[in-house]
Structures are given as structure tokens and as C-alpha cells.
Amino acid sequence: MSTQLQSVIAVVPAAGVGSRMKADRPKQYLKINGKTILEHTIEKLLSHPQVSQIVVAISDDDPYYPELALNQNPKVVRVSGGSERADSVLSALNCIAEQQLSDWVMVHDAARPCVQLSDIDKLISGAMSHDVGAILAAPVRDTMKRGAQGQIEHTVERADLWHALTPQMFRAKPLWNALSEALQQGVSITDEASAFEWKGLSPALVAGRSDNFKITQPEDLALAEFYLSQNKE
């Protein structure tokens, strides 16, 4: 498969509420160093030379996004977000198809502002050279336990376990098909790769940095602030 790519569209599903943060607003609108997490994330994606545009999925009743400068950025297109991640991604893919923006898309979590450009480079290379596409992932280093009712059942072999990260990059049309078919069948889709897995396809794993973590808990904010202060790409 060709490894030449002129540009890619980044999709950012940002319609979630982030209830585990126990904050007064969705976590993507919490601020780190004067900017919202969503602004950090989108600015990092747009700083990559091959990311030409962002399609961000936002809830229709979101009162915070219109106040951001992003709302006036011509490279950032807003679409209506859905109740689930897959619905938001499909909404973005519909926009991309209607405007014929790109054959390739990379989907990135709104709450992963610490992704490095070098990892995006590796992801693009990995996706372009694979029949299905690719995701960033990090090998599991900790001992893993399967539990039930607050007790350990057994230790899980970690040799072949990976933490799925984002971005995840695929051709737009096959991703739309995979997500649509999975949702029609009532399949639980937690990331884009899982839709392809359900169809019996195996996206490539591209080893990424472990500091590309998802902000989920209140204590994650300080860690993200540290990584962002160190990341001068």
C-alpha cells in the first residue's frame, strides 16, 4: 500500500460529560495553563503538517464551545455529537463524506492533549502501510489481575496485552461502514478499532508513548500540566 499522504482529517468526539471528574463542566472544558483541555488537544493536532482540518463533535446544547476561539477557526468544523462515541464519530464522518474532505481520518480523544507529533508520524506511516489501518497503543507493563466481587480471580498473562490509545487512523468509508454495521447489530463499540475487530479485521498496533494518556480522574490534571510543560514540539 502507498505510504504517500497529502493530508488527513482529524475527528475529535467531544460530546461526553466526563462524570468521573466530578467537575462543574465536562472535562474537556477544564483548564490547564489558561486553556481548556479541548483547546490543547486540537491545537496539537493542527500543529502536525499533515493534519489539514479538524471535525469536532459537540453536543447541540453545549454552552461552553461557542465561547472558545476554536469556534472561529476555519480549520475546525463543528458537527452535532451523539449520545455515544460511535454516534459522534459517525456524525463527523458524514460531514467529511459530504464535503469530500479526505479519504483518511484519524480519531483522537478530546481528553488526550499530550500526544506527541512524533507518535502521529508513526501512526500515519503504520496506517498507510496496512490494509485496515492502525492505532497507537502502549504495551502493558504492570501485572494484570482479573477480579470479581472485590477479589482476585487470577493473574492475566500480559505478554500480548496493549493499552489502546488514540489517534486511531483508518480510511473514512470503511470506518463508516464498520461503525454503522456494528451499531445496527447492537455491538458495544468502545473505540474505532473494535468496530473493525467485530468484522474480523485486525488493525495494526503502533507503539506509542505512555504519556499520551487520557485525562479521566481529577488527579490526572496535574500530570497533564507537567507533560504539557515538558512537551515543546
From Swiss-Prot:
<comment type="function">
    <text>Catalyzes the formation of 4-diphosphocytidyl-2-C-methyl-D-erythritol from CTP and 2-C-methyl-D-erythritol 4-phosphate (MEP).</text>
</comment>
<dbReference type="InterPro" id="IPR050088">
    <property type="entry name" value="IspD/TarI_cytidylyltransf_bact"/>
</dbReference>
<comment type="pathway">
    <text>Isoprenoid biosynthesis; isopentenyl diphosphate biosynthesis via DXP pathway; isopentenyl diphosphate from 1-deoxy-D-xylulose 5-phosphate: step 2/6.</text>
</comment>
<keyword id="KW-0548">Nucleotidyltransferase</keyword>
<keyword id="KW-0414">Isoprene biosynthesis</keyword>
<feature type="site" description="Positions MEP for the nucleophilic attack">
    <location>
        <position position="158"/>
    </location>
</feature>
<dbReference type="GO" id="GO:0050518">
    <property type="term" value="F:2-C-methyl-D-erythritol 4-phosphate cytidylyltransferase activity"/>
</dbReference>
<dbReference type="InterPro" id="IPR018294">
    <property type="entry name" value="ISPD_synthase_CS"/>
</dbReference>
<feature type="site" description="Positions MEP for the nucleophilic attack">
    <location>
        <position position="214"/>
    </location>
</feature>
<dbReference type="InterPro" id="IPR034683">
    <property type="entry name" value="IspD/TarI"/>
</dbReference>
<feature type="site" description="Transition state stabilizer">
    <location>
        <position position="27"/>
    </location>
</feature>
<dbReference type="InterPro" id="IPR001228">
    <property type="entry name" value="IspD"/>
</dbReference>
<dbReference type="GO" id="GO:0019288">
    <property type="term" value="P:isopentenyl diphosphate biosynthetic process, methylerythritol 4-phosphate pathway"/>
</dbReference>
<dbReference type="InterPro" id="IPR029044">
    <property type="entry name" value="Nucleotide-diphossugar_trans"/>
</dbReference>
<protein>
    <recommendedName>
        <fullName>2-C-methyl-D-erythritol 4-phosphate cytidylyltransferase</fullName>
        <ecNumber>2.7.7.60</ecNumber>
    </recommendedName>
</protein>
<comment type="similarity">
    <text>Belongs to the IspD/TarI cytidylyltransferase family. IspD subfamily.</text>
</comment>
<feature type="site" description="Transition state stabilizer">
    <location>
        <position position="20"/>
    </location>
</feature>
<keyword id="KW-0808">Transferase</keyword>
<dbReference type="Pfam" id="PF01128">
    <property type="entry name" value="IspD"/>
</dbReference>
